[in-house]
Amino acid sequence: MALNLLSIPPSYHGLIIQRIPLKTGLVPAEPLKTLAPSKSKLNTIEAKRIMSVLDEAINKVELITLMSYLESHPEALEDALPENFVEAIREHLDIGQALVEKASILQRKQKELEKGEEAEEDWDQERLLSIELHKTNLWPLTHQFRDSTKTILRLLINEPQLTRLLHTQAPGRSPGAQCLLTSLVELRGFLFEKLLTSPMEVREKNQFIQDISRRSKRNQEIIDALQAELAEVLKNKEAEVEKENFVIQELKNHLHQVFKFSENSLLRTKQEAEKQQKVDYRASQARQAKTQQDILALRAQYHNLVMENREAEQALRKKKYKVETEIENWIQKYDMEMNEKQEEYEDLETIHKEEKLQLEELKERHAVLVEEFSQIRAESEINSKKRVEAEREMVRMVRAATLIQAMWKGYLVRSMLRSRKKKRVKSKGKDKGKGKEKPKEEKGKEKKAKGKGKGKK
């Protein structure tokens, strides 16, 4: 009774844990496919906060259920843990040990009190007072145990490395702790589905459930009717089976009578068969004597045939010997001819090999000559190309020389014509100067014009 009042975590059974494989993953409960919500994410802040609080609670429960490994094996991770964490674990272990001892004492006293109640009707006031005193002393220890658990949990949350180390080192959880985790994960899935479901979807879900219940009710009525029909059919079947059993019994009686009749007929048949066997034996004795006489006659005939065939066999043996000797002679002759042919073939093969070697040498020489011919041909082509190019260059040079000579001759002719023209202009100017005198400005302009004309020419 007193232990039921205490809120001790489910993973501590006398500080000993039954090791099972770790299952820390959050597996949401699978909803019905036909009733799945339309949304896949939470939209409201309140719903997100509710889910975050539940996820944090699941994470804390996972860490608390793994703390039993630290309590049962404090020396396993003592080197890897900081000093404040080790001190908190030791304090937690001391408080837990004291709590378990006092709880066991309280439980023992309650059992003694129950035994006393069965023996006597008067209650022992002193025992009741001691039990109440133990309960009052147990409550502070319970609160201290909770506070130390919260402290260790806070240290684990603040140190992710310690959490990972604990996950890797801890071998498992107790069945109760694993069941609690599984229930929390299922609760998370149910709550997540509940938060995703809108009022319209809830009404649709209720309508769907009502439809299913009505359908189930109709199916149950159909099943009841079918069961009643089945019972009626079974009754009729049993009646038919009884009739068939009666017919089978009558057939068995008839079969028994037939069996007795067949035994009598079999006995009569056996007696008749014995009589017939005696008659057949006598007839077979007579046939056997006749067959013996036939055998003797056939033996004499066989002896005569053997004597006749022996002479024919000797003649055939002689003929066979003669044929075998002829065959041996032919074989020897064939072997001699084959040996001669073999020698001739070997000679031809040696000649063929020599000619083959000569052919290889000739092929090599031919390849060398072909290569030399190709080189000579390439050189001749290059020389012919160079010759053609030189001829073309000579033609270009001749054309250029003739063009230069023609240009030079033209230049000389033009220069001669220009000098003659200047002389004519000067003579004309002298004649005009005698008649009229031009102003100085016009003379300057004429000089400039003449200078421009010379520049253009």
From Swiss-Prot:
<dbReference type="Pfam" id="PF00612">
    <property type="entry name" value="IQ"/>
</dbReference>
<dbReference type="GO" id="GO:0005737">
    <property type="term" value="C:cytoplasm"/>
</dbReference>
<feature type="domain" description="IQ">
    <location>
        <begin position="397"/>
        <end position="426"/>
    </location>
</feature>
<keyword id="KW-0175">Coiled coil</keyword>
<feature type="region of interest" description="Disordered">
    <location>
        <begin position="419"/>
        <end position="457"/>
    </location>
</feature>
<dbReference type="InterPro" id="IPR000048">
    <property type="entry name" value="IQ_motif_EF-hand-BS"/>
</dbReference>
<dbReference type="GO" id="GO:0036064">
    <property type="term" value="C:ciliary basal body"/>
</dbReference>
<feature type="compositionally biased region" description="Basic and acidic residues">
    <location>
        <begin position="428"/>
        <end position="445"/>
    </location>
</feature>
<feature type="coiled-coil region">
    <location>
        <begin position="209"/>
        <end position="258"/>
    </location>
</feature>
<comment type="similarity">
    <text>Belongs to the DRC10 family.</text>
</comment>
<keyword id="KW-0969">Cilium</keyword>
<comment type="subunit">
    <text>Component of the nexin-dynein regulatory complex (N-DRC). Interacts with CFAP52.</text>
</comment>
<keyword id="KW-0282">Flagellum</keyword>
<keyword id="KW-0206">Cytoskeleton</keyword>
<keyword id="KW-0966">Cell projection</keyword>
<protein>
    <recommendedName>
        <fullName>Dynein regulatory complex protein 10</fullName>
    </recommendedName>
</protein>
<keyword id="KW-0963">Cytoplasm</keyword>
<feature type="compositionally biased region" description="Basic residues">
    <location>
        <begin position="446"/>
        <end position="457"/>
    </location>
</feature>
<feature type="coiled-coil region">
    <location>
        <begin position="101"/>
        <end position="127"/>
    </location>
</feature>
<feature type="coiled-coil region">
    <location>
        <begin position="292"/>
        <end position="381"/>
    </location>
</feature>
<dbReference type="InterPro" id="IPR042815">
    <property type="entry name" value="DRC10"/>
</dbReference>
<dbReference type="GO" id="GO:0031514">
    <property type="term" value="C:motile cilium"/>
</dbReference>
<comment type="function">
    <text>Component of the nexin-dynein regulatory complex (N-DRC), a key regulator of ciliary/flagellar motility which maintains the alignment and integrity of the distal axoneme and regulates microtubule sliding in motile axonemes.</text>
</comment>
